[in-house]
């Protein structure tokens, strides 16, 4: 089985998705799991994990219902206010559904990233997730990675998952020190043995707004990032994610998956490919795979 560990689904309402601008018309519609099944299956990928795209409590309920209705969705990474005094009560409700596997907050857009990550209530919230056996997805821009070092080091009781290889600034990749700073900061985080890394979301870190497809130079930079992540994390702490449908701003699902398929087949052994495509996700998210018949 191959698992796509990073997909988003929504019923599009402009007021709920302020990050979807008018320059992104391809995203201004509904997206459901069934909409991605054909390109997934064409790439040999049969299952997904739904990741929050809205910072509101009903997002978790919405995604859990989708998981109940769609067997291909193996798990949900939801959203809740991790600083809330009602966190324990909410988790007791949601964890009755085995599809709930973790949570994410869009830290990258916070006005004070270091302040949030060091906030005592936020720290307690993530610690409570970990005691419940739930993962936490870390979403940051590349220049913010140093801000997460102490936070990730302290939250070591369960898996943390770094989304999008730490979002390297590929649109500025040719500028002095951009790649080297990201590489250094990624390696520092990778020293934490409880941190997984998703090879995901890189096509939209390129200059997609000025191109109809990922350029040869950007494609080479993406492969370089994959190689750097492999060297830093090793094959037992990497997972594939498409970031569909957001990836469609720059590339179709099939192109994103094909890049990962070709990279994995050329860099990883058979057993390491099994880890990359499935086993690592099972460990990080505590997934229960459907029994084969």
Predicted regions and their residues:
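Divalent metal-dependent hydrolysis catalytic cores, especially in the metallo-beta-lactamase
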Residues: 21-29, 34-55, 73-81, 101-108, ...
């Amino acid at each position: 089985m191959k698992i796509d560990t990073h997909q988003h689904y929504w019923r599009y309402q402009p007021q709920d998705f302020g990050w979807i601008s008018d320059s992104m018309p391809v995203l201004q519609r509904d997206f459901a799991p069934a909409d991605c099944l054909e390109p997934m299956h064409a790439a040999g990928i049969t299952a997904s994990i739904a990741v929050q795209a809205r910072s509101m409590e009903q997002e978790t309920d919405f995604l859990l219902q989708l998981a109940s209705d769609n067997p291909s969705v193996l798990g949900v990474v939801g959203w809740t206010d991790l600083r809330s005094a009602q966190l324990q009560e909410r988790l007791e409700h949601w964890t009755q559904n085995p599809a709930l596997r973790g949570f994410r907050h869009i830290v990258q857009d916070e006005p004070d990233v270091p302040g949030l990550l060091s906030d005592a209530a936020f720290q307690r919230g993530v610690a409570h997730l970990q005691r419940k056996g739930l993962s936490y997805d870390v979403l940051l821009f590349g220049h913010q990675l140093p801000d997460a070092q102490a936070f990730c080091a302290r939250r070591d009781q369960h898996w943390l998952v770094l989304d999008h290889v730490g979002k390297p600034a590929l649109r500025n990749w040719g500028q002095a020190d951009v790649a080297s700073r990201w590489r250094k900061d990624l390696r520092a985080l990778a020293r934490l043995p409880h941190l997984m890394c998703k090879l995901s979301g890189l096509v939209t870190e390129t200059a997609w707004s000025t191109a109809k497809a990922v350029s040869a130079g950007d494609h080479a930079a993406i492969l370089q990032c994959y190689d750097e992540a492999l060297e830093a994390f090793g094959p037992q702490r990497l997972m594939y994610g498409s970031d569909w449908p957001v990836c469609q701003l720059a590339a179709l699902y099939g192109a994103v998956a094909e890049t990962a398929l070709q990279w994995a087949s050329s860099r990883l052994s058979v057993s390491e490919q099994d880890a990359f495509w499935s086993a690592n996700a099972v460990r990080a998210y505590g997934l229960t795979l459907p029994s084969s018949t």
